């Protein structure tokens, strides 16, 4: 939880947690959003890749690593798909990321595969999907698809498509 997710994402997460009876531990930065902004400014507004790297390190990568370390996790799974970005198209089903195995069971799934899986398992769509978003992240760096941009191209103003969680960079 970066502290910057849209309200719809928090509501959606709670709905899934309740409907599926999930036990979830929310991981967050040790630095509150307000403190981070006071120290570094709104890193997503500068249009500098280095500032986005700092933002991702503080809000995403470090909290995930702390959580994985806390529970001594040696392998974790993610829902990345090869069709999402050029970088993800080069990924393997199992890889080592920051000294841990990263399992990508959905790597070759298509949008159609996702749709039918969700239908067959009565999983609700993210509410922003109905509003034209095909990729949802933080409120300040996600936007609905349009004629020229869609998917992860809408993220971070088109400057970056990856936050660093799924890469060794």
Model-derived segments and spans:
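Nucleotide-activated chemistry modules centered on ATP-dependent adenylation/adenylyltransferase
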Residues: 1-169
């Amino acid at each position: 939880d970066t502290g910057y997710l849209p309200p719809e994402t928090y509501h959606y997460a709670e709905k899934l947690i309740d409907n599926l009876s999930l036990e979830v531990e929310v991981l967050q930065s040790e630095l509150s959003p307000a403190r981070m902004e006071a120290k570094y400014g709104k890193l997503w507004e500068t249009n500098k890749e280095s500032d986005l790297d700092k933002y991702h390190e503080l809000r995403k990568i470090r909290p995930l690593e702390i959580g994985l370390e806390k529970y001594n996790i040696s392998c974790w799974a993610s829902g990345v798909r090869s069709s999402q970005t050029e970088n993800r198209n080069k990924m393997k089903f199992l890889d080592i990321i920051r000294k841990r195995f990263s399992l990508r069971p959905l790597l070759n799934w298509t949008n159609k595969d996702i749709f039918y899986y969700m239908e067959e398992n009565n999983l609700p769509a993210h509410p922003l999907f109905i509003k034209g978003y095909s990729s949802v992240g933080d409120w300040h760096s996600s936007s609905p698809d349009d004629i020229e941009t869609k998917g992860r191209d809408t993220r971070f103003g088109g400057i970056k498509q990856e936050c660093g969680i799924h890469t060794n960079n």
